[in-house]
Amino acid sequence: MNTTNENAQKQSVWTQPMAQDQFDFMSTVLAAPSPIGFEAAMSYGVIKPEFESFMPASWGVHQFKGSASIVFDSHPGRDDLTSIMIVGHADKIRMQVRKIDEDGKVWINTDSFLPTTLIGHEVKVFCLDPEKSGAYKSITGCTVEALGAIHFSTPAQRTGEQGIKPESIYLELHMHGEDRKAQVEALGLRAGDPILLDRPIKRGVAADTFYGAYLDNGLGCFSVTEIARMLASEGLDKVRVLYTIATHEEIGRFGSTQVVGEIKPDVLIATDVNHDYEAAPGIGSRNMTPLKMGEGFTVGRGSVSSEFLVQTLANVCSEKEIPYQIDFSGRDMGTDGMAAALAGVDSAAITIGYPIRNMHTSSESAHTGDLLASIHAIAELLRHFNDFNNGNGITRDDLKNSHIRLDNL
């Protein structure tokens, strides 16, 4: 990189600390209580009001019967324009009440958490309020437990040779006295009630880092909103952008699949977390791509991703000196980028990621520079598509004829 380019990058947004008001909004997004099946707290409670504060009156909003997914449409009704959907998912992996025992223990389902990472952490339980018909309430001050004490563990558990089984995990509500099960039921708890980690994000020790629960994937929803905020006043008029907050990703990409199946975008861009493989203990020996937190966002190649989109984004980033890292996808992207394939919709797809540490724990950590780089990269990609064909915009035929041929080398 020459001196001129180096000086330009030093002034780039992604090399600077995230503005406090932007960090505060990100914190608000990540704090939304939006467990799987209850995503409206984020999509309707946080994201929708934020969009309404800046989006032009001409934009439209798509809502859905079966989920709290929501789509903000830059050009409603303009089916002549090539449509580009950017999607983040609002659902958080959650625990659930499974059984209330006679001694007051509440046995819970740990979902996509590793049981040992949950023990001792504070959580919130959400349940119907028995005193207010149809209303929900939250219960705080609960912890997740397993053995009760190290004194009750087996020798193999103490050495680490034996782990903690998911069915050993329970919720500690500190009930005592007689009829402890009745005490728990009187709070309103019943099977299926969702439980979330109570761990808001905080600034990290190293510069421009932060940590906490549920970066997966409030970060994607935050990014979608920030991209829209950046482009709302520019009036891109040659592409139709569909800013999407989806649901049920963690249990099968069901929300995005339903939304894509209904709206049928021409291009699908998924934004989600990825792994910092370089820092993950023992992972380097598995020969994974050495993705690093703080070195730029990630772009997945493989699976059903469009090589044309990958190379176009890479070229845009190179031109604008935006840092990115290439990752590989095997048979499945593992994100909402699969939604079009799962829905049977003809869309060119790509996945954008943020390399984080400690995924699916209470201490997920990330770098604000990676987020800011991805936001600007996707915004630049949309501008590029808008300027395609001498300012006439990218067409569906462009996409249909974009497939890389290895026989023309």
For every predicted segment, state its role.
Residues 1-409:
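N-terminal hydrophobic/helix-forming segments and targeting peptides
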